[in-house]
Amino acid sequence: MANKPSAEELKKNLSEMQFYVTQNHGTEPPFTGRLLHNKRDGVYHCLICDAPLFHSQTKYDSGCGWPSFYEPLSEESIRYIKDLSHGMQRIEIRCGNCDAHLGHVFPDGPQPTGERYCVNSASLRFTDGENGEEING
C-alpha cells in the first residue's frame, strides 16, 4: 500500500463527506454525488492517492444513485474485501494503492463482465481526457 496522508492532513484537505466515505467506509446519499451524471470522456482516479481506477467508457447509468462501472482499469486498481455489515453479504471495493474505501461490487451489471462497481463520487477525482480538467467528487 502506498503511503497515504495522516488522518489530520486528510481532515484538513477533504470535505466531511469525502473523509467519511474514504476513511470510515461510509456511503454518500444516493443521487447526490457530483460525478453521478458526468458523461465526459476521461479517467476516474482515487481521490486520496490519484491512482487511476476506472475509464469513462466503462461507466453506465445503473439507476442505483451512484456512479457505476462494469470494469476497473486493471485488477491491481481495486482491492476486494468481504463485507458482512448491516446484515448483508457484499464485496467492498477499495483503492488497490492506498486502501481508501470506494464502494461495493455486485454481480448484476451489464456485459461484458456482468459486474456493477457501485462507487461513491466522494471517493473519486475525474480527469477530463480532452482538456485535463479535474473534478473532485
From Swiss-Prot:
Residues 7-129 form the MsrB domain. Disulfide bonds: none annotated. The lineage of its organism: Bacteria, Pseudomonadati, Pseudomonadota, Gammaproteobacteria, Enterobacterales. Belongs to the MsrB Met sulfoxide reductase family. Its cofactor is Zn(2+). GO terms for molecular function: peptide-methionine (R)-S-oxide reductase activity; zinc ion binding. This is Peptide methionine sulfoxide reductase MsrB. The active site is at residue 118. Keywords: Metal-binding, Oxidoreductase, Zinc. InterPro entries: Met_Sox_Rdtase_MsrB, Met_Sox_Rdtase_MsrB_dom, Mss4-like_sf. The keyword Zinc applies. Its EC number is 1.8.4.12. PANTHER family: METHIONINE SULFOXIDE REDUCTASE (PTHR10173), METHIONINE-R-SULFOXIDE REDUCTASE B1 (PTHR10173:SF52). It comes from Escherichia coli O45:K1 (strain S88 / ExPEC). It holds the Pfam family SelR. The keyword Zinc applies. It catalyses: L-methionyl-[protein] + [thioredoxin]-disulfide + H2O = L-methionyl-(R)-S-oxide-[protein] + [thioredoxin]-dithiol. Zn(2+) binds at residues 46, 49, 95, 98. GO terms for biological process: protein repair; response to oxidative stress. It comes from the Bacteria. One of its GO terms (cellular component) is cytoplasm. Binds 1 zinc ion per subunit. The zinc ion is important for the structural integrity of the protein. HAMAP family: MsrB.
